[in-house]
Amino acid sequence: MVKDTKPLAYAANNGYQQKGSSFDFDPSAPPPFKIAEIRASIPKHCWVKNPWRSLSYVLRDVLVIAALVAAAIHFDNWLLWLIYCPIQGTMFWALFVLGHDCGHGSFSDSPLLNSLVGHILHSSILVPYHGWRISHRTHHQNHGHIEKDESWVPLTEKIYKNLDSMTRLIRFTVPFPLFVYPIYLFSRSPGKEGSHFNPYSNLFPPSERKGIAISTLCWATMFSLLIYLSFITSPLLVLKLYGIPYWIFVMWLDFVTYLHHHGHHQKLPWYRGKEWSYLRGGLTTVDRDYGWIYNIHHDIGTHVIHHLFPQIPHYHLVEATQAAKPVLGDYYREPERSAPLPFHLIKYLIQSMRQDHFVSDTGDVVYYQTDSLLLHSQRD
């Protein structure tokens, strides 16, 4: 039933192990550099946050969104709607990334400005700002840790085998996993409990309950506004202007976040216990190239340096990554260059969903394993 994907043995030779007369790189080997060395390689100006520059990106995105809405309402034909929905959904995703930067504090040095802008941006696309910010902080603090990570965490073999066959098939068959984000906000992932909307959820410490309540209220206000607009205009108009673009945004979010932490062709280790460290966990992330979309969604594809140093503003991430690559060496996985649109990544998503099903219940360094029965059912 199970095809085991075994990791290479640990290497003491800067991440390499000898096999015959050649050396193979072992991505799970402790790196020969410290995080301070990576930090020192990044130019000082890359750490500087410019709130006016950050706000200019907000203005850019809001103006594009407003122009798209105005054009769609003015021309109102089905051909334009077919163009409008994916473009507007992509712009919703761009807003999410800017709100994400507010949550990290990379938007500005002002907590008040970060919170204000973050609430406006995230509430407008039905994301509870503080609830998501805090769970995402947990994700960054524990990236690559099987038991403590928060985003797209591998299922252990025990949890996987307790899923019924239909749940397994849906979870690992594209496009179904690309629609799970709203479910995650309400109930988290299999094996975890809690809601991003509940101030008393075990996701949050008591000191942050007030912020969670405020964000949930903002979310509810936006949701109520959409219902009100449906009554005074028409449900179909709100569906076309907002509903379908919202689901395009959700697909972008799940697509991007999954691929930054998975890649069957790249053999990414996951850790437990004493083998995990902040640096080793961060090095399991993957950069991706999105072609023309790269700038639209604010350089989120430069994910390795972002995960190690989330306080770096997005507009400095490309330069910071280039500066750090000589230190990272083979621990940095060079992304495949994209055509104008990143259709090549769909192949990687499908391959990973077909191969990366669960990890062992034991072991401090583990890799994804494949359920051969599920693999065959996906191909049938």
Swiss-Prot record:
UniProt record, GO biological process: unsaturated fatty acid biosynthetic process
Q: Which key words tag this protein in UniProt?
A: Endoplasmic reticulum, Fatty acid biosynthesis, Fatty acid metabolism, Lipid biosynthesis, Lipid metabolism, Membrane, Oxidoreductase, Transmembrane, Transmembrane helix
Per the Swiss-Prot or TrEMBL annotation, the motif Histidine box-1 is positioned at 100-104
- Free-text comment on this protein's domains from its UniProt entry: The histidine box domains may contain the active site and/or be involved in metal ion binding.
Source species of the chain: Glycine max
The answer to whether the entry has keyword Aminoacyl-tRNA synthetase is: no
User: Part of which pathway?
Assistant: Lipid metabolism; polyunsaturated fatty acid biosynthesis
Q: InterPro entries under this entry?
A: FA_desaturase_dom, FAS_N, Fatty_acid_desaturase
- Its biological function? Microsomal (ER) omega-3 fatty acid desaturase introduces the third double bond in the biosynthesis of 18:3 fatty acids, important constituents of plant membranes. It is thought to use cytochrome b5 as an electron donor and to act on fatty acids esterified to phosphatidylcholine and, possibly, other phospholipids.
For this chain, the annotated S-S bridges are none
- State which gene encodes it: FAD3
Q: Name one GO cellular component term.
A: endoplasmic reticulum membrane
Q: What is this protein called?
A: Omega-3 fatty acid desaturase, endoplasmic reticulum
The record describes its membrane topology as: Multi-pass membrane protein
One Pfam entry for this protein is: DUF3474
